[in-house]
Structure formats: C-alpha cells, structure tokens
C-alpha cells in the first residue's frame, strides 16, 4: 500500500493504531465451506481471532458456517449482499445492497464494520454509509491469494517482511483463493507467531 493513500483517504481505517505485536487478519468473500472451515481450524491452532467480511448471499447459503464463525469468537462483518463494485453501481443500489447484507448479519451478531469489495467505493457512497454508522475498513497488506499466477513464496516473503504492529491483512476464504490460501495462511501465521505476534479481530467503535 502506498504510504500516501491513508493520508488522502482519511475516512477509512487502513491499520489499527497500536505498538503491541498484534496482526488483524481479515477474510473476504465467504463463507464457503471448504476454505472457511480450513481458516477456522487454522485460527484455532494459534488461538487467534479474526474478522470475516462476508457476502450476504453466501451467508444465506451457508448459515451454519456463519454461526460457527460467531461461536468461535470471531467477527462477522459486511461485504455487501452481492459483492458489488462501488464504482460501477449507482449510489442508491449500493447503499441498499449494503443495508440488505447488514440485515442478514444482524440475525447473528451486529457489527458496524464494512469493507467495500475490491476496495472500490465512491465518495458519496462513503458519506452515506458513514452517516448510517458503518466503519469502513480497508487494509495495509494483501496476500494476493486470489491470484493463481502469483509466486507464492515471493508473496509470502513480502507479506511477512511488511507486517507491522496493527497491520490489517487481507486473505480470502473463497473457492477462487483456495489453492493459494491453504499454503499461505498457515505459513504466514507460523512466521508471525515465531516473531511474537498475536492475532485479533478488528475492534468496533460501536
């Protein structure tokens, strides 16, 4: 992430302000049975907590998984109902879709955290969602696990090297990311654990 980006877009949370050795793992696009259960099992090994930015339609398909996420002490958060691209969606449709996902989430546990799919959201959409009480969460590190052409070892090396206290890291618990995720996540968590880091869910101000 370019260092100037958070300064330009101050309405978003890019990392958590802390000097403690804590990493904030986030998982986008689930729940999806195989990758999500793998993630939950891996988190359990490290007594780690995480934040799951879920697509509402996937929650409705896999309600038992959404409940498992909550039962294991993690956070369910909003990633729109249908994984919309903010730049290509009308203002009203985007806000309605986000609110529809929120209604689904509130059947389990209310969180004010929201991440726009692809990180794409307009100023007007941002203004409306923040006025409605959403906290817009971006990231300072991304795994690129969704890209099946990446050099996994090189991507891991960069991810580990650039991790800092308070980093918000993006993985994906999706079928598309599965081949890369199942290799990268355990190795990343082991490396950071060896450096003395713990893993927590993103705190909400609500």
Model-derived regions, located:
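N-terminal pre-catalytic segment of deacetylase/amide-hydrolase enzymes
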Residues: 1-26, 31-47, 61-64, 186-206
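CE4/NodB-like, metal-dependent polysaccharide N-deacetylase domain
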Residues: 40-49, 75, 84, 91-123, ...
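Charged helix-capping and loop-helix junction motifs
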Residues: 67, 91-98, 150-157, 182-186
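Catalytic grooves of carbohydrate-active enzymes
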Residues: 163-176, 180-203
């Amino acid at each position: 992430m370019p260092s100037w980006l958070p300064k330009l877009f101050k309405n978003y949370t890019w990392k958590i302000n802390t000097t403690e050795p804590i990493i904030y793992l986030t998982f986008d696009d689930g729940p999806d049975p195989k990758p999500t259960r793998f993630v939950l099992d891996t988190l359990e090994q490290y007594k780690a907590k995480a934040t799951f930015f879920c697509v509402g339609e996937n929650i409705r398909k896999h309600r038992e998984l959404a409940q498992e996420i909550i039962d294991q002490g993690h956070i369910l958060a909003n990633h729109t109902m249908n994984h919309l691209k903010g730049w290509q969606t009308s203002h009203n449709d985007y806000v309605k879709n986000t609110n529809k996902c929120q209604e689904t989430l509130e059947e389990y546990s209310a969180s004010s955290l929201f991440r726009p799919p692809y990180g794409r959201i307009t100023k007007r959409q941002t203004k409306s969602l923040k006025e409605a009480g959403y906290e817009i969460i971006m990231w300072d590190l991304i795994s690129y696990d969704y890209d099946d052409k990446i050099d996994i070892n090189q991507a891991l090396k960069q991810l580990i090297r650039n991790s800092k206290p308070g980093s918000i890291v993006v993985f994906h618990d999706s079928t598309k990311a599965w081949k890369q995720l199942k290799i990268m996540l355990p190795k990343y968590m082991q490396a950071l654990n060896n450096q003395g880091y713990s893993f927590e869910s993103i705190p909400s101000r609500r």
